[in-house]
Amino acid sequence: MTNIRKTHPLLKIINHSFIDLPAPSNISSWWNFGSLLGICLMIQILTGLFLAMHYTSDTMTAFSSVTHICRDVNYGWLIRYLHANGASMFFICLFLHVGRGMYYGSYTFMETWNIGVILLFAVMATAFMGYVLPWGQMSFWGATVITNLLSAIPYIGTTLVEWIWGGFSVDKATLTRFFAFHFILPFIIAALVIVHLLFLHETGSNNPTGLNSEADKIPFHPYYTIKDILGVLMMVSFLMTLVLFFPDLLGDPDNYMPANPLNTPPHIKPEWYFLFAYAILRSIPNKLGGVLALILSILILALLPFLHTSKQRSLMFRPITQTLYWILVANLLVLTWIGGQPVEHPFIIIGQLASISYFSIILILMPISGIIEDKMLKWNL
């Protein structure tokens, strides 16, 4: 008798995706982040659902409803901090997942990669709107500053901003719609994740060598299920340490003050995971130019398949491009640091140099190094 998991219409989809899926035998721990992101998404949806049961999306009561969750709801403080720090965990895994894709040339799976870029934008939008909901000082001013960037769009900018605000400033209407979008987007993300996996399973996974692994596949279960469980345990341990010992480490103290439109905080800055993009935005003196650079800093990922010049897929055997890659990583850390600093000397010039090098490495230096490496190998294939 054939096993039910191979015949049942629903179970066989799960079987082909997580049990009998042929996977390359040599994928390293860098391939764990997909499953970790799935766990992060589930944690965020569940904690978010319980928070939404007690939260009110009204300017008069939003801040106090979050206080009520932390003080009066059973384990409300735990749910709230799991949700807030879960977002940070989500972005840590996201950046590592994207970094893995860049290093090993996974972007050559065009459909999977492009859905991934859309997912990144969707997660960033969700996180931004979620940061507005507690209605603290940084929530209000962050929302004001970031939505105001749209006014840089010629002709329709001002109208567009007022349409998004639902008035002439960030107010009750803005908070209500941000809550609605923040609630619905994770489910759209979950649907996109399924499409992401669908396209991935059409081609099969990449592997560290970047070579074809058709000749040597192993079943996903038990080999990679047990490996994923180890990754999940490590991530959850890290998350719980963060939540139980340092819950406010990654937050902004200003957000413990209720939103006040009459009092601007000394340094308006987003959450840590947006600081690199914020630094790029601020490094350009022109408003429209800054907005374009901000969007391009993420959208540039969609160009990677077209910027790949090497005959090798992975960076595993390409020392010059490897060096450039790690310089890029260091550069992103510098941008993240600059994004959290005030706009004054020497931070302005450091931010501008880091922004120029960010785009230069991806658009110019990496494609050139790919050609040089091929020439050095005398590959005339």
Swiss-Prot record:
Per the record, what is one GO cellular component? mitochondrial inner membrane
Q: Where does a ubiquinone bind?
A: 201
Membrane topology for this entry? Answer: Multi-pass membrane protein
The entry marks the following residues as binding heme b b566, namely 97, 196
Q: Which residues bind heme b b562?
A: 83, 182
Described function: Component of the ubiquinol-cytochrome c reductase complex (complex III or cytochrome b-c1 complex) that is part of the mitochondrial respiratory chain. The b-c1 complex mediates electron transfer from ubiquinol to cytochrome c. Contributes to the generation of a proton gradient across the mitochondrial membrane that is then used for ATP synthesis.
| Protein name listed in UniProt | Cytochrome b
State the organism named in the record: Apodemus flavicollis
